[in-house]
Amino acid sequence: GLTAGLSIHALDSFREYSGLKNTKSVVSGATGGVGSISVMLLSKLGSEVTAVTGKNDQSDFLHSIGASNILSREELAETAKKPIGKSLWDIGVDVASGEVLSLLLTSLSPGGAIACSGLVGGHSFESSIFPFILRGNALIGIDSVEIPLEDKRHAWEHFSHDWVLEGLDKIIKEVPLEDLEVEIESILSGGQIGRVLVKI
């Protein structure tokens, strides 16, 4: 949950702590570990969350953790066919990069921002300058590894106070060590949902 927490904190900071309530947000990779926690947290904070997923059979799961709307990757591509499109979201959490990030950037509202932390969709992306100079949008990189321990502690304190999440059992699967190989194969094939807790 650290990366998700840092992403949400960065977006809140970008909005000068005006709060995330009543915002429209988008989360890519929404069935994964970072994505699912982001959906839950944004929903808890009062944002209307659109979950973007390549797992079209997981709508019930995504609704159960707080997503108001669900878009397939194909539907996302249909919403963004121009360098700058209709304003759909105020903020976003992107774990994919690549084409998905390119598409999300075209649909941000004026003054919007995306916190990007992953590269499962590729290590590069394409964008025009328009979202940045015509709408004042921002792309915020999230580093959850090299940041100071104090910054990590600050995020964890949020989770233990004002960001306490209920229903984590929906996104956590506990497995014995001998089943770890099966879970790794599921991750590599893109079939993993939520987080896996290995019981030793």
Regions picked out by a protein language model, each given a short descriptive name:
Residues G1-R73:
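Mid-domain Rossmann-like dinucleotide-binding core that forms the NAD(H)/NADP(H) cofactor-binding site
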Residues A67, L88-D90, F132:
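Local beta-strand N-terminus motif with an aromatic residue
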Residues L76-S87:
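Short amphipathic alpha-helix with an adjacent loop that forms part of the alpha/beta core around
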Residues D90-V93, A115:
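N-terminal Rossmann-like NAD(P) cofactor-binding module of classical short-chain dehydrogenase/reductase
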Residues D94-V95, I200:
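Short, well-ordered coil/turn residues at beta-beta hairpins
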Residues E99-L165:
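Glycine-rich phosphate-binding loop and adjacent beta-alpha segment
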Residues E150-I200:
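C-terminal hydrophobic helical "lid"/dimerization subdomain
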